[in-house]
From Swiss-Prot:
Residues covered by region (Disordered): 238-429, 481-540
Membrane association type: Single-pass membrane protein
Species per Swiss-Prot/TrEMBL record: Acetivibrio thermocellus (strain ATCC 27405 / DSM 1237 / JCM 9322 / NBRC 103400 / NCIMB 10682 / NRRL B-4536 / VPI 7372)
Highest taxon in the source lineage: Bacteria
Coiled-coil regions listed in the entry: 451-501
Name recorded for this polypeptide: Anti-sigma-I factor RsgI7
Extent of Basic and acidic residues compositional bias: 238-256, 319-329, 338-351, 359-370, 398-419
Residues exposed to the Cytoplasmic side: 1-50
Residues in compartment: Extracellular: 74-540
A GO CC term assigned to this protein in UniProt: plasma membrane
InterPro entries linked: Anti-sigma_RsgI_N, RsgI_M
Lineage, top ranks: Bacteria, Bacillati, Bacillota, Clostridia, Eubacteriales
Length: 540
């Protein structure tokens, strides 16, 4: 049987026989394209049946390999979730977040293991574990409970997703079971899990023990290895609450005469400084002392029978001096409020000192240097309160010094004005509300009535503005609606007029007049005869 060579390769040649079949044969040296050759008895070729067999075998192998890979990947551990209460469990997950296995890390954890955990979702497994822990009494309603959850895995993004899912499911289950418990969720590295596994402890408990060692270096892993999570957390918090010995050193070093920080005025001092009343004995009468000294607690301890009361310059004084005090020398940079008693003889303050003095009867020499601000708390029988806004000097007179007047006429104040000194007309002076160095100072803090009036005025103004704006908006809206309605009505009328007239017709048909066909024929010119045709007709 002969065939023609169509294609050739290094090893094979393709020929076509008379029937049109393509046959593959071995190439020989005499084979040339387009030549006819004799076909051998044995021909190399693929039939349809053999091809189907090969394809089916390949497909079967592919299906088997894919199934085996899916089974292998399904059973391959991908991430781990540890649940620590006192029973410790480890949930092993695959890459699809399905539970492959649940292992108990201690004897109590074996009580919570069930066969139904396998092939279930993570949230279902966590829910079953917490429910069984509540049912078996590991989590109680009356006690403080703590659940430690640790997540470890190969993919950090997936670890964070599992962390959020586990925390939300745990809180949901605890709320459904009416159990109050603290849920602590942490993510760890796989190396830390292996370290905890070598020590025979849960990873979450290992983290808590390391935190306990930071607070208490004496703590050991073996000591807290078998203790529940709740107890470890409680010990950490108790140790943090106890103050250190280093924090007490500053308190022991403090001396009564040298406070570290200036203290604000007490409520009792404010009440006594505000009590200025009329004096019935006359304008030149002696100054009587204030007897309200029980509530005034001294910040600086002073000895009895001191002869002189001296304060160093640039000192702010806040102290209570008992009867018979004659000499008191506090250190500089302190605030002392002097309630001076009967037997004080010399009360001398240097420049730039701010004092609040309650002056007694027998004070003979009460001298204050320049640049001093003095606010004297005077009893009922006092009538004159010397105030020096120019910071020159201010003194309280005695019986022997009636004729000596060191105060200008501008600096005198009436007792009736002093009555209302704290009723809103003049706020009580406080160095902590000084606007020059306190950025949060507000002058209305001392006057709540003025603040209420201002808020009322603001509210009334705001309401008026709202009403005016609403009226303006309503008027504008009405005008706009009327204008739009007028425009719409005009447009509708115009459209109706256009429809009724012939202007809406086709403009090409307006001037066109229909004429009868006969008239068109009459107006048409006759067609001229073709040359030669009539002659032929006549001849015929």
């Amino acid at each position: 049987m002969r065939a023609m060579v169509v294609d050739m390769n290094d090893k094979y040649a393709v020929v076509v026989n008379k029937e049109g079949q393509y046959i593959k044969i071995k190439r020989k040296a005499e084979h040339r394209l387009g030549y006819q050759v004799e076909l051998p008895d044995r021909v190399i070729g693929f039939e349809r049946r053999t091809l189907l067999k090969v394809v089916s075998v390949a497909a079967a192998l592919l299906i088997v390999s894919s199934i085996s890979f899916a089974v292998y990947s399904y059973n391959l551990p991908y991430s781990y979730v540890n649940v620590d209460i006192n029973p410790s469990l480890e949930i092993i997950l695959n890459m699809y977040n399905r539970i492959i296995d649940v292992k108990a890390l201690n004897s109590e954890g074996e009580m919570l293991i069930e066969d139904s955990y396998k092939n279930s979702r993570l949230d279902e497994g966590v829910e079953k574990i917490i429910d069984s822990a509540v049912a078996q009494g590991f989590l109680k309603n009356d006690e403080e409970n703590t659940i430690m959850l640790t997540v470890a895995g190969k993919n950090s993004r997936k670890v964070l997703e599992i962390k959020e899912e586990v925390e939300s499911t745990a809180n949901k289950v605890l709320n459904d079971d009416n159990v109050v418990s603290e849920v602590i969720v942490e993510n760890i590295v796989l190396e830390r899990r292996e370290e905890a596994r070598e020590l025979g402890i849960a990873p979450g408990k290992l983290l808590l023990i390391e935190k306990l060692k930071e607070v208490d270096p004496k703590a050991t892993t073996e000591e807290y290895k078998d203790k529940p999570v709740n107890e470890i957390v409680k010990t950490i918090r108790d140790i943090k609450k106890v103050p250190n010995e280093n924090n007490r050193k500053d308190d022991d070093k403090k001396v009564n005469n040298e406070p570290n920080k200036p203290l604000p005025d007490r409520k009792a001092d404010v009440e006594t400084s505000a009590g200025v009343k009329e004096n019935t004995a006359g304008p030149d009468a002696g100054i009587k002392p204030v007897n309200k000294t029980d509530n005034a607690k001294p910040n600086v301890g002073t000895d009895i029978n001191n002869k002189e009361n001296k304060t160093v310059s640039n000192a702010k004084i806040d102290s209570g001096i008992d009867k018979g005090n004659k000499d008191s020398k506090p250190n500089s940079n302190t605030k002392i409020n002097n309630d001076v008693k009967k037997d004080n003889k010399d009360n001398k303050t240097n420049s730039d000192a701010k004092t609040f003095n309650d002056v007694s009867k027998d004070n003979k020499n009460d001298k204050a240097d320049g640049n001093a601000k003095i606010n004297n708390n005077i009893n009922r029988d006092n009538k004159i309160t010397p105030i020096n806004p120019d910071n020159k000097f201010s003194s309280g007179g005695s019986k022997d010094d009636k004729d000596n007047k060191h105060v200008d006429s501008k600096d005198k104040m009436n007792n009736e004005d002093n009555k209302n000194i704290n009723n809103g007309s003049c706020p009580q002076y406080n160095p902590y509300w000084n606007p020059y160095w306190n950025p949060y100072w507000n002058p209305y803090w001392g006057n709540p009535k003025e603040k209420e009036d201002m808020t009322k005025q603001n509210d009334e103004w705001f309401k008026k503005m709202q009403e005016e704006q609403k009226k303006q908006y309503d008027e504008w809206l009405k005008k706009m609606q009327e204008e739009q309605k007028k425009q719409h009505d005009e447009w509708v009328k115009k459209m109706e007029e256009m429809k009724n007239t012939e202007k809406m017709k086709n403009p090409y048909q307006e001037n066109k007049i229909e004429k009868p066909k006969e008239a068109e024929k009459e107006n048409k010119p006759d067609r001229p005869p073709e040359p030669g045709k009539e002659i032929l007709k006549k001849r015929c």
